[in-house]
Amino acid sequence: MLQDPDSDQPLNSLDVKPLRKPRIPMETFRKVGIPIIIALLSLASIIIVVVLIKVILDKYYFLCGQPLHFIPRKQLCDGELDCPLGEDEEHCVKSFPEGPAVAVRLSKDRSTLQVLDSATGNWFSACFDNFTEALAETACRQMGYSSKPTFRAVEIGPDQDLDVVEITENSQELRMRNSSGPCLSGSLVSLHCLACGKSLKTPRVVGVEEASVDSWPWQVSIQYDKQHVCGGSILDPHWVLTAAHCFRKHTDVFNWKVRAGSDKLGSFPSLAVAKIIIIEFNPMYPKDNDIALMKLQFPLTFSGTVRPICLPFFDEELTPATPLWIIGWGFTKQNGGKMSDILLQASVQVIDSTRCNADDAYQGEVTEKMMCAGIPEGGVDTCQGDSGGPLMYQSDQWHVVGIVSWGYGCGGPSTPGVYTKVSAYLNWIYNVWKAEL
């Protein structure tokens, strides 16, 4: 066995000292480590400053393009072009006129289809003879629906008051067949443009109580800068129904979000809004037209906790004392109350409009495009934060018959809640939808 001639220690000696890792000299740390730490801290500080600047700019300023410059955010949607290309007025709440009458409608008599003869102004019931899926799709498109419809034959009833005619299509609209004879099938067309108004759970008829999203899967929270402002109702994958007065203070679309799928505020993801559309203001009736449609940037995926509610039928006239439901996260007391974190529900009833307009109530302020609901003795009502939410009626499905609009106080016996009557605005809703197809 060879041995290093310069070594004093034999190779087979057990007296071997372990090797030690060399220590990093303090001078090296001072020269390399400290500058690296300083650089990292400086970079972190710069990032924090940049983020803070961006947050401040996004909150208080809007960036115009060509040329790039900032304008105060309060100048957004003020009706004046402050950016050279007008970007500051693009993403704003827009008004939409009522428009022409939509020439198809659905009746509360089993959702039967009626068609307008534009030449005479008369309405006719659609006979089931030769009615096809293509005609059903045309009818629903005329009302602005994009989903696949369903239809069936229902027997002509003894109270049928409209003439029954065969239907054809011309220029993507339904028309009466010129040579239409008697309705040989003896059946009308029952049409459903969207599966709606079905929930997983039926509410109990009691006073005010905590609600479950399983009972009201169409209820949404409409929020500005992450703060709940109003309620709303899902009508289809793209559209949410609410009140126009929710957007009086903030008419820019950017910071509005919709939250769906939960009965707890803030516990569900937000959805971006593409458009907010209101009806044109009528100075003669300033409290009329309190209705708005929000178009979502991306369509909703329906589930057990996210579903649409049905629109009312055009002839849905509810008599006094008809039971209805209200829901919302609004204030639990008129004075000194606070917003509820949990969705609340309550049973109310239709209040006669004559009683609602009495001298000790609203003194004629409630118009034909509004309706009143509450309980005669008072104490159950919508309040601040419930605005825009649905007033609901259940037949075979749930229908949104009203939108929480206004009132004097919350829960007074002579001043019940006043609601936008949705059936009065069906034509406007259909025209908006058609324009956005």
From Swiss-Prot:
Kindly list the GO molecular function terms attached to this UniProt entry: serine-type endopeptidase activity; serine-type peptidase activity
Limits of the SRCR domain: 94-204
Active site annotation, chain numbering = H245 (charge relay system), D290 (charge relay system), S387 (charge relay system)
Where it mainly occurs, coarsely classed, is: membrane
Q: Which residues lie on this side of the membrane: Cytoplasmic?
A: 1-32
Q: What does this protein do?
A: Plasma membrane-anchored serine protease that directly induces processing of pro-uPA/PLAU into the active form through proteolytic activity. Seems to be capable of activating ENaC.
What is the name of the protein in this document? Transmembrane protease serine 4
Q: Which gene encodes it?
A: TMPRSS4
